[in-house]
Amino acid sequence: MSLQIRNDPFTQRLQQIGQWIAQGLLQPAAQALTEAQAQHPKDVRVALMGVRLAQQAGNLAGAVQAARRAVALEPGWFVAVTELALQLAAQGQFSEAMEHARHAVALAPKEPRVLHSAANVAQGAGDGKQALTWAQTALQLDPQNHPLRLDYAGMLYRERQYKQAQDEFNRVLQAQPGNEAALRNLLTCALQLGDQSEAQRLADVLIIRNPDDEQVRYWHAVAHGQTPKTQPEASVTGLFDDYAQRFDLHLVSGLKYRAPERVAQILLALRPDRRFNVLDLGCGTGLLGVYLGRLHGHLIGVDLSEKMIEQAARHGIYSRFHHVNILDALRDTPADHYEVITCLDALIYVGDLAPVIPNAFRILKAGGHFIFTCEAASEDEADLVLRPDSNRYAHKASAVERQCREAGFDEVQFEHLESLRNEGGKALPGFIVIARKPLAVPADAPAAA
């Protein structure tokens, strides 16, 4: 939120501090801000400038603390209250963030900036209905605010109101014909609405504009009825960076996701002495580590989302993390290195298993286990299916077993699940695969790609 604007010398000093923060000159900014605090200890603008400084330094807890000081100084000022709501949301403290968001809206019910910020807090908290209400009110007050309309359209899309979202994205595009975000979102709306010809038209426009963009190439292939082998890194990273703060609560409580708990049980039954090393591919927020507990070995996490890794690190169970994609981790890890490799709820984004299974076999020590989950494609579907509603891959069990055995695994067991997770209120079938590398690997075992 913006600060109150004055023209006195102290305000000019604060503006100078703000410029230093924007330029990354944090040490002189911090020193000057400390002096400003000593001179004007009750000026709320100093506290709000402290929020900016802490944000730039990557100190999220410090940003919350500074925002709390601002509210303590001016409890009835909507700018300070809104800032605290935003900073709490950034820390994943959504319950308190929503309290302050509601308070801010009550203080300034006709201020579009407040309503827009409150809507973003609600969206992060998983309260899509409230987010839409606040965003719609903000848009009624400020109908020419195109970034706000773009956010509102995105909220409609996330609530699966695809036609309404399409209408709003079109309004943005009419006002700003070059708006790339609106154009890309119109493409995904067309796909969700089953309008293949419109999706193809939009995809063709985008590919001409952005021939080297991997996300555009991906969606161009989907729009033209092809199944890309894998999803673009940027798509997966963006999804989970946005999702990280509420991932555990949403996945476990909302979607009834139990795979990490079940896989931990399987592992401890196979190796009750806990003497094994695990490579956890797509570790997310570290749910497998939570259910496994301490090992007499190393638990190494791999994830493409740095924010997910930050959440996983809080458990204090993982030995270390690698911020890379799964395929790179598999390719670059030395052979005969781990007793266990896990990959839970991640292959739905990886897609093609050809570079996955043989490399997992190579990395495992003799007698090691590769345990992974897949969403289930039926046996009358293709080996690899891209679900248009969720944009996730499903795998056919018989094809997965064939690939495991071709790679050299001698035991391949399946645990079929009627509900891998809930999706749109319905159980989504899937399976857990437990593949064992032989105790003695044949000399003619196939090489990894």
Regions found by a protein language model. Name each.
Residues 331-341:
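A short acidic, Gly/Pro-enriched loop at the edge of an enzyme's catalytic core
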Residues 354-366:
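A short glycine-rich, Lys/Arg-flanked "PGG" loop and its adjoining helix->strand segment in the class I
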Residues 279, 285-330:
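Class I SAM-dependent methyltransferase SAM/SAH-binding core
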Residues 22-23, 56, 90-91, 124-125, ...:
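Register position in tetratricopeptide repeats
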Residues 10, 44-45, 78-79, 112-113, ...:
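Helix-start (N-cap) detector for alpha-helical repeat units in TPR-like alpha-solenoids
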